[in-house]
Amino acid sequence: MKERWEKTFSQALDREMEFGVFGDDTAEKLCLAFPPQNGRFYDFHNFGMVETAAPWIEAGKLQIVCPDGIDGETWSDENGDPQYRIELQERWYHHIVDELLPPFARAGGKAMVCGCSMGGVHAGNFFFRRPDLFDMMLSMSGLFNGQYFFHDYMDDLVYANSPVHFLPNMPYDHPWMTLYRQSRIILCVGQGAWEEDLLHGTWELDAILTAKGIPHWADYWGFDVAHDWCWWQKQFPYFLEHLFPIEQNAG
């Protein structure tokens, strides 16, 4: 499998940002894979997630790009100034959609977003904010309420990064609703150790999508399924097989 590690200067963040790329630029689908909370661009590779996707990468079905994160300065910095934190988060959002994504974008095609834990939070935010850019979302052990991280603080940017707040207020005939209904949306969460908050967060979004008539797949795994890499390593290829079936050679 082709892999490369790169860095680029982000005008949005005024700093260098690193990322990993796995697979060929001619692959059918681009997938942005976000790291877990406070994680780095190499985590998806180092914890074996890229390896579980090798059959799809090698078959030319998928190219995975792993951005770097700044959660420690934004979502996780609960003692920091909330306005500064969410404004910095918005600058990171623009780094992803305006700087990182365009060189990899396929002509006439949209990308996929995925992630586990905080990566699943990011996947949800990018997908629901920009269904004009993304038409597949796989969130493993994510949640979708910005106030989980910002508590009593709310402004227009926290709202924009909180699908459980803005989706209920979106009119049924909003143009984004049509794009959501044309997309593939997968939510997955375990019911075991350390998944309690994520389970509630998945239920919350599941109910909103159902009420809005947005097709989706909410998959609740067993009570032995914990918030851990060993389970995400099982979930990722399981869902890739549903999204990108690989034909088996007969005989």
Predicted regions: what they are:
Residues 1-251:
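Non-catalytic cap/lid and distal C-terminal segments of serine-dependent acyl enzymes
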